[in-house]
Amino acid sequence: MSGGAYWPRPWSCEDGGNRRLGVPEGQVGPGIRPEEGLEVTAVKDAFATDMVIRREPGELYALRHGLPLGNPLVASVEGWVEKLDPETLEVTASTPRLPAGRFWPGGIGAHENGDIYMVFGRWAHRLSPGLEVLASHSLPVDRPHNSFVVLDGGELVTKDCDAPEARH
């Protein structure tokens, strides 16, 4: 990863890292030769899934959430993280529904300490790789927050969404 104290595997956070290149660093591509093809092995209808990250081989995590009723920047929602089997996309573990507050897509990332962090709405949650909730914290600004980045020192940095509809 270029910058940030992320888990040292490709695609362990939103957009592939702090530089937001949208590509998994450290991989040159899938290596498909002209005589080879791709095959779909699983399809999963997972409505309201914002993003998927990897940690170790075989570990795939999805950020899920409820949908707000009415104005999405005012209505309160819950979010959760699911661990998926990478071959079947079946859910192998899940957090409980976690408080989020007002809706904004948020994000998840695998930290270099091994834990999964989730920033969604006005809440930050720390999760074990098995998706036990280790800590939850309501962020100080009562507005939804837009995901996060992890700095080289391991600190998480997020920003609130200052959309006019999000203000009281």
Residue ranges and their predicted role:
Residues 18-19, 66-72, 123-125, 162-166:
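Short glycine/acidic-enriched loop and turn motifs that connect beta-strands
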Residues 18-47:
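A short helix->beta-strand "capping" segment at the edge of beta-propeller domains
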Residues 85-88, 128-132:
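Short loop/turn segments that connect beta-strands within beta-propeller blades
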Residues 45-52, 100-109, 141-153:
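Repeated scaffold domains used in trafficking and secretory/extracellular systems
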Residues 35-42, 90-98, 132-138:
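A short beta-strand motif characteristic of beta-propeller blades
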Residues 12, 59-61, 115-117, 155-157:
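Conserved beta-propeller blade signature
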Residues 8, 76-78:
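A detector of repeated loop/turn-to-beta-strand junctions in beta-rich toroidal repeat architectures
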Residues 130-153, 158-167:
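Asp-box/WD-like beta-propeller blade repeats and closely related beta-sheet repeat scaffolds
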